Regions:
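Canonical RRM/RBD RNA-binding surface and closely related RRM-like beta-sheet modules
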Residues: 2-47, 51-60, 69-71
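"Short basic amphipathic alpha-helical interaction patches in structured regions
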Residues: 63-65
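Low-complexity RS/RG/RGG-rich segments used by eukaryotic RNA-binding proteins and nuclear co-regulators
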Residues: 67-92
């Protein structure tokens, strides 16, 4: 199975790696290797990347993978009604 890594192009600059990791761990997509935030100076938003070591074989992960393979984004609700539009990065 291809291991997709994810990009969150717009993350409020108040979020840290731990908060993003916790949100994605709750989705149970797979085993997260690391979360990296690219900080933008004097901006309200940063860019974040979620790197997976392995994706799980469960319904939630399969739905996400199906969307990613069709070059569609995934809507991740982190605090109702707030959400991130998440896209794939290049596979490892």
């Amino acid at each position: 199975m291809t291991t997709y890594n994810l990009c969150i192009p717009r993350v409020f600059n108040t979020f840290d790696e731990s908060q993003i990791r916790t949100t994605f761990e709750q989705l149970n997509f797979g085993h997260i290797d690391k979360v990296v935030i690219v900080r933008k100076k004097n901006e309200k938003f940063n860019i974040a990347f979620v790197y997976y070591r392995k994706w799980y074989d469960n319904e939630n992960a399969q739905r996400a993978i199906a969307r990613l393979e069709n070059n569609q984004d995934i809507k991740i609700v982190y605090d109702t009604p707030w959400f991130w539009k998440v896209t794939k990065t290049n596979p490892r």
